[in-house]
Amino acid sequence: MDGSEDDPTIFSARCLPSDPRLWATVTNSYLGTRVYHDTIHINGVYNGAVGDTHRASLPSPLNVQLEAPAGTEQLTETFTLDTNTGSFLHTLEGPSFRASQRIYAHRVLPHVLVFSVSIARLTTGNKPITVPLRADFSPESPDLDLRVGPDFQGLRYLHGHVLNPEQPGEPQQEVHMLWMPVPPALTLGEEEKDRTWEFLTVVGSSQAEAQDCFAEALQLQTRGVLYTIHADSWGRLWAGCGLDVAGPLALRQALRGSLYYLFSELPQPGTQGFISHGLSPGGLSNGSKEECYWGHIFWDQDIWMFPNILMFHPEAARAILEYRVRTLGGALKNGQNLGYQGAKFAWESASTGLEVCPEDIYGTQEIHINGAVALAFQLYYYYTQDSKLFQEDGGWDVVSSVAEFWCSRVEWSSQDKMYHLKGVMPPDEYHSGVNNSVYTNVLVQNSLHFAAALAKDLGLPIRKQWLEVADRIKIPFDSEQNFHPEFDGYERGEEVKQADVVLLGYPVPFPLTPDIRRKNLETYEAVTSPQGPAMTWSMFAVGWMELRDPSRAQVHLSRSFANVTEPFKVWTENADGSGAVNFLTGMGGFLQAALFGCTGFRITEAGVTFDPLCPDLVSRVSVSGISYLGNKINFAFSKDSVTLEVTARAEPWAPLLEAELWPSLAHLPLTPGQKVSFPHSAGRIQRSSP
C-alpha cells in the first residue's frame, strides 16, 4: 500500500464492498453521485407528486470502470477515497504499468463532474499499453422526459424535464447535460511514458448554462489545471478548519470521514449567490424513488447537521436557514391544512416546503420539527449577530410564524392551569398520539422565549401570548423519581426508539441539575432500542461528558462505530445496515459528540462557553477554524491544559475577543496571532470587556 493504513484522511481497500450502497460518494453543492453508480442527482430537482416526491435520477456518464489489460498477471488493485482532495481513485498496477482512474465532483465548478484515467509505463519497454474501459450508460431516466440533442463541440447532449412536479401546476424543472463520450479502451503509445485523459460531465438548468459551465471547465482543462484547482480548493478548506484527536485511528478516521461527507454538500467558502435546497439524511448522492426519504429535508438538517456547519462555516449555515425562509409559504400552508395559525414546517420537505411525507401521521404529529427550525435560527443569531437575516431577509417571519403555530396548537387545561400539547409524536417514534412530549414542550418554550427576545432586539412588539404560553406550558417531571417522563403517562421501563428526553440540556438548551441530568440518562439508557438510529449514542456520550464521566462517554462513542462501514466510512442509519446510507444525520450527531461534547462548547447569547473533557482513549482534542463573530479561532486541550488562538479576524467588523475563565472570572485577551494557554478550566469566549 502507500502508508494510508495509518492515515486518518485516506481510506483504501483492495476491493469494493459487496454492498454497492456502501461505496464512496463524490458530491459538491450542486451534483452528487456514488462511484460506479448509474445515477446523478441535482440539488433541488425532484420528481413525483406529494407522497411520491423523490430526487430525479439523471443517467450518469461517470459509470465507467477500468479493466485489466489482456494477459496481465500479478495485478495489484486498490480503491481509495482521498478526503484531502475530495476524490476517489481506482488503481491497477502490474509489473510494467500503472493505470488509475480518478473520480470527483468539482468543488470550484459545481456543475461539473470529472473522471480521469492515467496510464504510466513502469519499465523500459515501448509496447503500447491498452486499458479497457467498461462503460454502462443509457440516456434514459424513470423521472425525466429526456431527448438526445445535437452534439456540442464534440460532447454528447441530453436534455429534458421532470415528468411530475411536486405540486400540480408547477413548472417542470429542466435538465441539460453535456458529456464527453467514453471510448472502449485507452492506449498509451509506443513512445509515451505516461498520459492522462479527462472526461467531463456538465449539468445545468438550461442549455446556455450547461454550455457556459463547459466553456469554463474547458478553459481550465486546456491549461492543465482542472484537477489542481479542485484539489487546491479542498486543501484550502482543510487548512481553514478541522477536528482531530490524539486517540484511536478508527476514531480519527470516523471524524475525518464525517467531516468530508458533510462538507462535500456545502459550497466552497466565499462562494457568491449559492442557493441551498437543504441537507437530506442521505445527502445529494441518495434519494431516488426507492429511497425517497433519504433525499427529503427533515429535522435532521436543523438539529443534527446544522450546529457543526455553523461553527465552521456560518455563511453556509445562513444559506441553510434561507432554505427555510424560501419554503415558509409551504409551511404556512401546512399549518392552515391542519387547522392552525402560523407555520408548520413539513416533517419531510422538498422544493416547496409542503409536506411530502407519504404517511400522514408523521407530518401531523412530529411537530417538534418546528422547534428544531427555530433553534437553528436562534443559534445562528447568537453566533453571528447577523441581524440582517432577521430584519431584512425573512428570518423574523420564520421565527414569529413558528411562535404563532405553537400558540394556536396548544390547549389550556383549566384543571392544572397549564397549556398542554396533545396528540403528538416525539423523536421516539415508537410512541404516537401522546400528550405533552417533554422534548417537544421544551422546544415550544424555547421557541417562544426566543421569538419574544428577538422582537425586543428588533424593536418589534412582543405578543403577550408568546410569553404566557412559554411560561405556562406543561413540562412533565416526576419529582418522586427525579426524572422527566417522556410524555404524560410514560411508565419507566417502556422501550424507546432513540435519543429523546436525553436531548434536553444538549442540543436543546434547558437548565437541568446534575442529578436530574444523570437520572434522565440512566433511565433512558436502559430502555433505548439497540436498533435505534446512529445519532442516539452520540447524545448519550455528550450527556456523560457534561457530567464529567469520560468512561461512560467513551462507551457510547464506541457504540456509534457499529454504524460506520468499511472501508470508506459510509454511515448507515441503523446498526444492522438498514435504512439510509451515507447517513449524514448520524455523522452530524457523531461530530457534535466531539465538537460540542468533548469541548463543552455551547452557543449562548453571551458567548461560546467551553468545559473540555477528554473521553477515555483520547489524550488531546484539536479544533481549528471555528468562526465566531467574524473571528477564526483554534481551540485545543489535553487533560491538563487549554490553548486558544484567534488566528485571523476574517471580517473587518469582527470584535476583539477574550476568554473568561471559571470560577476565577479571570479575563484573558485573545489578541489575533497570539496563543493563550491556561490550566484546564471551563469558561466562555466572548466580546472583550469595555
From Swiss-Prot:
Instruction: Note the Pfam families from the entry.
Output: Glyco_hydro_65m (PF03632)
Question: Hydrolase: is it a keyword of this entry?
Answer: yes
Residues annotated for substrate binding in this entry: 299-300, 497-498
This protein's source sits in the domain of life called: Eukaryota
Catalytic residues per the record?
A: 429 (proton donor)
Q: Which reaction does it catalyse?
A: (5R)-5-O-[alpha-D-glucosyl-(1->2)-beta-D-galactosyl]-5-hydroxy-L-lysyl-[collagen] + H2O = (5R)-5-O-(beta-D-galactosyl)-5-hydroxy-L-lysyl-[collagen] + D-glucose
Q: What is this protein's function per UniProt?
A: Catalyzes the hydrolysis of glucose from the disaccharide unit linked to hydroxylysine residues of collagen and collagen-like proteins.
Protein name, UniProt field: Protein-glucosylgalactosylhydroxylysine glucosidase
